[in-house]
């Protein structure tokens, strides 16, 4: 199957995250033609800085496959992984990462830095820009709506009791 097919699954998970008020990031981990791990951003829901889509998907794939080494898998994620998630990908020995939109603020694969090219014991192959327009549009729409919502809320002023 093609990368776009599995990125569509990650996009569906990102849409679920957005529907729950989470930053819309989704992730699918595939071995062969089978999805073995799914994850979506749950930081607000779980009140945890660790609840990223990639971390959730890696955990599910490890449990399902019975080990922490995901040597035969490809990780599909809608947004370029952050440093924490890139580290988890290295630790899980995932050989291939496919992402949609770049992350100019926190991307640790190509944008801000490249953890995968540093002197670690594992260097995943990276494919970027798969369904980039759709992934980027989902994020742009989410943050546009969030800014509009925040502007409509009354602002607290020092000295006021409300």
Give the ranges of each region predicted by the language model:
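Zinc-dependent deaminase
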Residues: 1-17, 84, 88-162
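Short, basic and Ser/Thr-rich N-terminal targeting/leader segments
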Residues: 21-25, 69-71
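Short beta-strand scaffold segments in enzyme catalytic cores
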Residues: 25-33
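Short secondary-structure boundary/capping segments
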Residues: 27, 66-67, 116-118
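A short acidic/small-residue loop/turn micro-motif
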Residues: 43-45
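Helix-adjacent hinge/juxtasegments
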Residues: 50, 55, 59-92, 96
